[in-house]
Amino acid sequence: MANAPVSPVVLVILDGWGYRQEANANAIAAANTPNVDAFFATYPSTLIHTSGKRVGLPDGQMGNSEVGHLNLGAGRVVPQELVRISDAIEDGSFLRNDVLVKVCRETRQAGKKLHLIGLCSDGGVHSHLNHLLGLLDLAKVNGIADVHIHAITDGRDTNTTEGINYLQQIQAHIDKFGVGSISTISGRYFAMDRDRRWDRVKQAYDVMTQNGNLDQRSFAEILQSHYDNGVTDEFIPPVRLKEGAIEPGDGVIFYNFRPDRARQLSYALVDKNFQGFERELIPDLNFVTFTQYDANLPVQVAFAPQNLTKILGEVIADNGLKQFRTAETEKYPHVTYFFNGGLEVAFEGEDRELISSPQVATYDQKPEMSAKAVTDAACQAIEKGIYSLVVINYANPDMVGHTGKLEAAVQAIETVDHCLGRLVATIGKMGGTTLITADHGNAEYMADQNGKSWTAHTTNPVPFILIEGERRKVVGHGADVVLRENGCLADVAPTILDILGIDKPQEMTGQSLIAPAPYAVTRRR
């Protein structure tokens, strides 16, 4: 006799779908969303926190996709690398970090150059300006005179033309302490691609690893010229200001702490089997990354990864249940690597499907992205009737929100709403329960108070909607399930375990978002 189909719990992550009451510059409010509107009107919902200390970041710091998925999968507030590194600088232990001191000492003794690569902003998503300034202080203390900064401009996690101000702050620090020079500039569109668009990465790689062909203008003149022509920080074409190429035996510190957008350039610089584009390997680089970008990278890591145990994926596997993850390229690492606490490998019984993101320069050109294909993959997996947990990410609100184009963001929201209608119907047909939430805000705030396009994330809360399925009811509740207020992302994994009837491990400090029933009820799941 065949086993009955499994009725899953499906976690749907609407990346960048925040909540904001004001309708102005709000793509979500402006969009036609009949499905989400019906969900809010019909099913229990609440708002949860996705920023600041509630997700392991400094107070007031906006959340991001990496942090969001770490907290979602871990079931606890995970102290973030931004805080770890900033605290080390503040308490002085940064200057005693064994890996950082070692690369400085060996670079000085060999008479080589020290290169500092990273995103130059205070966005706090991939890097922080204070960390670069801390590295300049480290170089000064260790007597390194030849220090070259390969600046990556932001314009995505910050205002679009703030780059000139950040570089001026760096230059002021250089002038004050007498160490370092801004040798190259590359927009993050080139240096921090994560979708194997190697033609972009090659342009950044070339300016960092070659000499000659210098732009004689100051960095301020270069950036202002681009701003005047409508080119913002994210898209600044790679340019070389001073001689200072990365050469054999040099020391290199890549100070981004978030891995996903630092991997490709790192592989280009150190991987002997690299095939992204034609280049000769630069031998004997003394290469350090702030955090572990990839376990297979032949580099030293200054801040070793935290070991998270008994996370959601692991608990599901330990209970002999199968799970499925899917997203398109832009968010695939988030539902796999980050959701699994920084583990590259899948758990036993964890299946994955990667959907390719469209090959366009910016996603306002195709706001629907690959949402339909993601929905197809999710529905097919759900209909197999073998998965107890399904995790899906829709990238559209975040990726199109980052373009700052309101009309395109509205189209992105409407695309996702349409897909949700089909997805939730499929889950319902299988008797499953749907949890709809987001990892952080973005698309609900597309322009600042001055009307200038806003391309960064927000600190707004996000929705959490619970749609019970007939064969996956919440245990111990009657007809009405009540969701508590003031929750956070760390509470989602315990909620899933609550619905599945699995005991929460003590390592999970989050609490189920399902409020205790006011009276005892026995109910079939």
Swiss-Prot record:
SUPFAM superfamilies: 2,3-Bisphosphoglycerate-independent phosphoglycerate mutase, substrate-binding domain, Alkaline phosphatase-like. Keywords: Glycolysis, Isomerase, Manganese, Metal-binding. GO terms for molecular function: manganese ion binding; phosphoglycerate mutase activity. The active site is at S65 (phosphoserine intermediate). HAMAP family: GpmI (MF_01038). NCBIfam families: pgm_bpd_ind. This is 2,3-bisphosphoglycerate-independent phosphoglycerate mutase. It comes from Picosynechococcus sp. (strain ATCC 27264 / PCC 7002 / PR-6) (Agmenellum quadruplicatum).
